[in-house]
Amino acid sequence: MIKELMHDPIFLAGKSEVATKEDLQFAQDLLDTLMAHRESCVGMAANMIGVRKRIIAFLDESGRAPTYTVMLNPEIIKKDGAYDTEEGCLSLLGGPRKCKRYKTIKVQYQTLEMQTRTKNFTGWTAQIIQHEVDHCNGILI
């Protein structure tokens, strides 16, 4: 179900809780909402739809064809190649803001089947994931 986007900076600055299998409907809602905003958005975290759970959804361009991916409880366990960039966010008013990102990251997460996976990401997809994991950690750009 498509949800309304959250714009309250106090709510967005709160850390998200661990997601469980009972939270899978939130994951679907997040994906539905991201796809509804696909013209202007490439990633979302659950707190952006008012749910403080560690769930992210994003456009994954790391494979042969772009696909939407959902991760539960993502943790960046390794990062390399720091660079400065600017990013925008649908949750925040105003234009792009400066931030630091990494060219390559290794992420440990759970799938929708609650299986733990570890995967490396680079480039644009890595940047999107870092932005959404920041949301889970209560960090706003």
Model-derived segments and spans:
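Positively charged
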Residues: 1-141
